Amino acid sequence: MIEPHAPAPPGAAPPWGGQSRPWLPVRPGVGRFFVLAGVFVCAACGLVYELELVALASYLIGDSVTQASVVLSVMVFAMGIGSLAAKRLRPHAAAGFGAIEAALALVGGSSAMALYAVFAWTGDWGGVWAGGPRCLLVAFSLAIGLLIGAEVPLLMELIQRIRRQDAGGAVADLFAADYVGALVGGLAFPFLLLPLLGQLEGVLLTGTVNALAGGALVLGLFRRDLTRRGRWLLIVVNLVVLGLLATAAVLVDDFERAARQAVYGRDVRVALQTGVQEVVLTGGTRGRPLDLFLDGRLRVSGHDERRYHEALVHPAMSDGRHARVLVLGGGDGLAAREVLRYADVARVDVVELDAGVVRLARRDPALSSLNAHAYDDPRVHVVTADAFCRLRHTRSAYDVVISDLPDPGITASTKLYSQEFYGLVSRVLAPGGRLVVHAGPVASRPRAYWTVEATVRAAGLRTVPYRVGGRDTGFAAGPDRSTDASRAPRDWGFVLASRTGPALSLGPGGPRLRTLTRASLAADALDPGRARPPDVAPSTLVHPRYAD
């Protein structure tokens, strides 16, 4: 983005010594158009670099709000510093602009691979190395911001060399080209680059376009401003940058496989980008347990998923009617598997945002075997939608609602743990209906857990909190790799709720369970009077309270 630059006062001599307009290979109007086109392209590339850092940092480090704040604030600050620093380059605006664009193309184009590499190979070292991705994120934000900020004073000089105009008009033209370019870059990143190329290849292509645009503008329009040696030096620098970016593009698939193995181990079997999230499956063959990762977070582990899903589903299914069941999330089909063990279930609606996860749960032999081919059962109906939006528009009533969603500390899921969300759930509960919520680990994140419980109560439901221990797998990848090992979750927390107050029990006529018994369930009930912190407030859409 452009930082304002104060132009020379009206009537002041031009900085190149008061000479007449320099020689140009085209008419002044055409040359001015080319400069503004360069501003447009560079602005688009600059915004792609910003968005790429925010997106990758949110995936690797977590908490998208914090990462966006860090990247944008550091980058805008650095842009101001870069604009001031570029004053010294104004007498050599063409050479300076060419060098800055080459550096920006290299730094911005390589930023995603460098950040991913540091995360993959040092993220689990612990100690000072655990903060490596965060430090590198700040460093890239600072470097890219400095280079972007240095562009505009130089572009102002170049456009004034072509044809002198009043300061306000020059600034307006530059800002217009910059903001339109930023719009194009901002829309191209989520709708073209990410779906078609992914983060790594997308930003490499952006760096290539950046280098070509900057080099072509200087060498094509202002080559007479450079010495012969300067022209050749700029050509060599740009060729080196383009060669490095091209080499990275050729090796990006091998790099991504190696980095993925460093994060997930060497047993990666499926890795795909669905448009909603990255989905990785490991194991599931030759007796090895299956693990499902969503955006780097371990979502399902074959080691202990049975304990989790039995504790999630069966207490809610054991007390009252359960002919109609709504599963929010749970695209892996494992919650539906447990629901379908009750013969009198007439319909199961699964509301899942990511159709790719459902497709994988249907087709992958290991995952479909683990969920007992739940999606082949005619009683199961899948709705691809955001759970919040679906609840706002549905008028159906359900005997049981199962909230099998990502942990509440993940920013993208915060609205699905809000008072407004549970108010919508309460509206679709049939008389005597029950809600069960996966509320995150109790031992390692007690405040987040009790905030969920307080939020459900604030929606007008009576709650019974409980937990299940014996969790064998803690955080293994993604943002959670940097979590202190002492806080790795070893339990799951749940909240059972209804309008009248549910009973935490297992019915006598229920299916035979492998891990959950009446005695263990009774022992795992939590006493709110003793365990609940005294000052926990409910979370709302406008005031989320799940940050630790």
From Swiss-Prot:
This is Polyamine aminopropyltransferase. It comes from Streptomyces avermitilis (strain ATCC 31267 / DSM 46492 / JCM 5070 / NBRC 14893 / NCIMB 12804 / NRRL 8165 / MA-4680). Catalyzes the irreversible transfer of a propylamine group from the amino donor S-adenosylmethioninamine (decarboxy-AdoMet) to putrescine (1,4-diaminobutane) to yield spermidine. It is found in: Cell membrane. Disulfide bonds: none annotated. It comes from the Bacteria. One of its GO terms (molecular function) is spermidine synthase activity. Residues 230-488 are annotated as: Spermidine synthase. The chain crosses the membrane at residues 33-53, 65-85, 102-122, 136-156, 180-200, 202-222, 232-252. PROSITE patterns: PABS_1, PABS_2. GO terms for biological process: spermidine biosynthetic process. The active site is at residue 404. The keyword Transmembrane helix applies. SUPFAM superfamilies: MFS general substrate transporter, S-adenosyl-L-methionine-dependent methyltransferases. Homodimer or homotetramer. The keyword Protease does not apply. Residues 249-487 form the PABS domain. Keywords: Cell membrane, Membrane, Polyamine biosynthesis, Spermidine biosynthesis, Transferase, Transmembrane, Transmembrane helix.
